């Protein structure tokens, strides 16, 4: 019975020693460092110039585009006149090419 108790104690002690030694071997020690350095400085040992951080800016979704469109009978408070409808026949005449009506017209 004493032999099994000793074996268990030895196994438990060796297990605790291994577990307590692994974090320091892997650099995962939980002790607080005396100097605080950034991760690149800690790994590469040196000072690096400050890098400019990019910010992702959300577009302004509250822009009023109502003046871009005119629906004719809108009940909006703005009373902007509708743009004149272009005379396409006049445009084609100026170019010397009046479109003929399609088949069946």
Swiss-Prot record:
It comes from the Eukaryota. The modification Hydroxyproline is found at residues 99, 101. GO terms for molecular function: hormone activity. Residues 68-80 have a biased composition (Low complexity). Keywords: Apoplast, Developmental protein, Hormone, Hydroxylation, Secreted, Signal. Disulfide bonds: none annotated. The mature small signaling peptide is generated by proteolytic processing of the longer precursor. Induction: Induced by brassinosteroids (BR) but repressed by abscisic acid (ABA) and salicylic acid (SA). Residues 68-105 are annotated as: Disordered. Belongs to the C-terminally encoded plant signaling peptide (CEP) family. This is Precursor of CEP15. It comes from Arabidopsis thaliana. The lineage of its organism: Eukaryota, Viridiplantae, Streptophyta, Embryophyta, Tracheophyta.
